[in-house]
Amino acid sequence: MTDYSYRSGTANFWGIVAVFILAYIFTGGMLFGSTVSRLEPETSNRMYNIRFIASIVWIIGTVVTICIGFDALAGWTVCVFLVLMILSLNIYSEPDYYSQRIISEIPDSMYNRFCKFPFFTGVVNGLVWIALMVTLTAAVALGGTVLFLKHNDFMSVVVLLIIFTLHINAHGLFANFYRQIFVGDGKKAGVGQIAFFSFVLTNILSAFLLNMFFRSSRLSEGLLMFVNPFYCMSYHSDGIIVGIIGGLFWFGAGILCNIKT
């Protein structure tokens, strides 16, 4: 059996330790910052500094892990995707009109406004920022497999993480739909309906991708059955209960992120 453990004296041991420390700081800082930002007045662009600092940390972490080696880069990539999954639920609790007001208050050129748009507070802004981060992280992972001459199995894991992020975005959309239709004043019913249909279509699309790329993967069978009821129905008819429980779990997480906003 192959030994994947790391011990003191093993090649890249302290590099791996540094990566995990950096990842913990990155994750904890993002969660703490996004939580504290909600206590600020609504007149402030509360997510700008958080996303900007996170982008700088991402650049530093990526450069450091590339210098250490492929194992460090792989671990960093997984940690980044986990943070993006958490923030995917968080962004749907942001009032979307923030972006329109803030972008009109900044007396800069249109070029500067366009470059700063992903960092502004707002649902659309958050989606753009996460999409950019996912794309850049996947591109770095692909470049790492080529640079370090590794097998493409790692890219299969990256595709799996992208699909997983897609799932959680779908549940965040559905939680936002629930809040606007059943909890809010009902004035955003059109937005809520779009969110609902996006939730359904996203799940169907991700189920199709799972069947295409991971039909025989035990990882997708064990992990993603917990996430997507549509995938359960297409893969194992008796696994629908697991999928429903997983769907309720992520739906509850999305509702919690939408409370008090």
Q: Which role does the model predict for each range below?
A:
Residues 2-261:
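Transmembrane alpha-helical segments and their membrane-interface loop/helix boundaries
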